[in-house]
């Protein structure tokens, strides 16, 4: 038997049978991808891949506590299972007691499709999309612009089984589309991205029309110095900032005084008001169009995850409600340390509570300000304030009297997303969006455009 023919549920059952540890968690991730790439108004490559990753988590009880060992391998066959299990057990025996040790999760009903074959994607996912893309190539060519980009679709079937009796399964589709339009001399560039589950809700013609309009705006070039400007952040930029904020919202780190969510004098800022706008930042594994695993899948332990929590059911969670900080990410272990509720990370993020205004309507209501396309190369400067730095990219536009006057130079920015929430004066209509910076790791987001009266453009950037 090979990794291509072994049934995943049989693999995880056989792995559990081989275990000699006091506890065992097995995670099989069956993944398949299909992709298209293009450049200069022509397809360049396409392909389909398939693979498997098997993770074994062994737990060993001792006088001083329970230790854990984690080993992951790709393309594992039935004949290689025992060596994988022994390696995880050896890692557990060689480790000290796990700080986050807890009893393995029990009492979660078995997934009814646990023994079914894994879901798989194929090039058929592009059946309607590819011809529409070809038509966009023709329009772009006639309009004197070049289209570059890629479309990627992934399906991951996760099988999670434990010695405590859990048998869980989740199928996760994930699609991304990134389209970049350039002028023939490459001096003007515009970007648009979309997140999708099946490529049935993306329209390359509409995206190309949007990019053509932006390239037209860029025909007039305006140089501006660094400074603080009223700025309209589109949903993709808001997503990039708030995803990083979520990744920095571990309850334990905050309680220990190490993050922006630490309260001066001790404790956390849970209960404090972060924004005067009635904004709610939330996650929900059952959010329509942004569905994600309804249980914890942890391949390793860290500040915001614990391998002992694998299989723990996930529920809709409000991180910020009506502008007030309500929850930080907490495992069972960190919840016990901080006295906060158990609120594990969830694989999507939604910000709502703004008006029904579109970004275009917000532009029309701007006397003078900047309109961004997206952010890039975001890095943390100071965890205590969550100060981030990064670059604007693929189009920054000056808005005057409700209309785009032209394209300005790019900037480096220095801002904290927490501070931005506090200074924001308007949020518009929430819509699904693709974060540009974090799209390799996090794609399921819905955000509104946000108006900030004094966004800090700290220096001029020479990037396009």
Features from the language model and the residues they span:
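Active-site bordering "gate/hinge" segments
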Residues: 1-306, 321-322, 347, 403, ...
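Dual-mode signal for accessory low-complexity, basic/Gly-rich regions
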Residues: 110, 266-464
């Amino acid at each position: 038997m090979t990794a291509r023919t072994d049934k995943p549920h049989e693999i995880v059952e056989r792995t559990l049978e081989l275990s000699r540890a006091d506890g065992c968690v097995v995670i099989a991730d069956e993944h398949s991808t299909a992709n298209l790439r293009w450049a200069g108004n022509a397809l360049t490559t396409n392909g389909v891949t398939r693979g498997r990753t098997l993770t074994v988590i062994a737990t060993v009880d001792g006088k001083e506590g329970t230790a854990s060992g984690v080993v992951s391998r790709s393309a594992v066959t039935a004949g290689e299972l025992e060596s994988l299990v022994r390696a995880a057990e050896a890692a557990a025996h060689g480790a000290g007691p796990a700080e986050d040790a807890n009893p393995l999760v029990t009492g979660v009903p078995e997934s009814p499709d646990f023994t079914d074959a894994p879901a798989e994607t194929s090039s058929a996912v592009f059946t309607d999309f590819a011809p529409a893309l070809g038509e966009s190539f023709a329009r772009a060519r006639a309009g004197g612009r070049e289209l570059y980009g890629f479309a990627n679709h992934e399906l991951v079937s996760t099988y999670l089984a434990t010695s405590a009796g859990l048998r869980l399964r989740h199928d996760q589709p994930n699609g991304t589309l990134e389209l970049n339009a350039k002028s023939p001399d490459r001096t003007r560039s515009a970007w648009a991205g979309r997140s999708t589950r099946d490529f049935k809700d993306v329209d390359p013609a509409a995206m190309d029309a949007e990019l053509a309009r932006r390239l037209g705006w860029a025909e007039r070039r305006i140089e501006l110095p660094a400074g603080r400007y009223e700025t309209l952040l589109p949903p993709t930029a808001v997503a990039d900032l708030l995803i990083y904020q979520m990744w920095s919202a571990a309850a334990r780190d905050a309680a220990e005084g190490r993050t922006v969510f630490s309260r001066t004098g001790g404790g956390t800022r849970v209960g404090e008001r972060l924004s005067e706008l009635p904004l709610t930042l939330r996650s929900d594994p059952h959010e329509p169009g942004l569905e994600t695993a309804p249980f914890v899948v942890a391949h390793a332990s860290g500040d915001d995850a614990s391998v002992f929590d694998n299989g723990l059911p996930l529920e809709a969670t409000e991180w910020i409600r009506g502008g007030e900080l309500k929850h930080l990410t907490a495992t069972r272990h960190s919840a016990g340390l901080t006295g906060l509720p158990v609120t594990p990370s969830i694989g999507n993020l939604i910000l709502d509570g703004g008006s029904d205004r579109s970004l275009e309507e917000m532009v029309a209501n701007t006397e003078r300000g900047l309109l961004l396309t997206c952010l890039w190369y975001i890095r943390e400067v100071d965890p205590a304030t969550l100060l981030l730095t990064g670059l604007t990219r693929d189009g920054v536009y000056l808005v005057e009297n409700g209309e785009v006057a032209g394209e300005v130079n790019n900037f480096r920015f220095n801002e904290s997303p927490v501070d931005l929430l506090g200074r924001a004066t308007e949020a518009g209509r929430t819509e699904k969006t693709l974060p540009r910076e974090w799209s390799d790791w996090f794609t399921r987001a819905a955000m509104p455009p946000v108006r900030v009266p004094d966004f800090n453009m700290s220096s001029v950037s020479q990037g396009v």
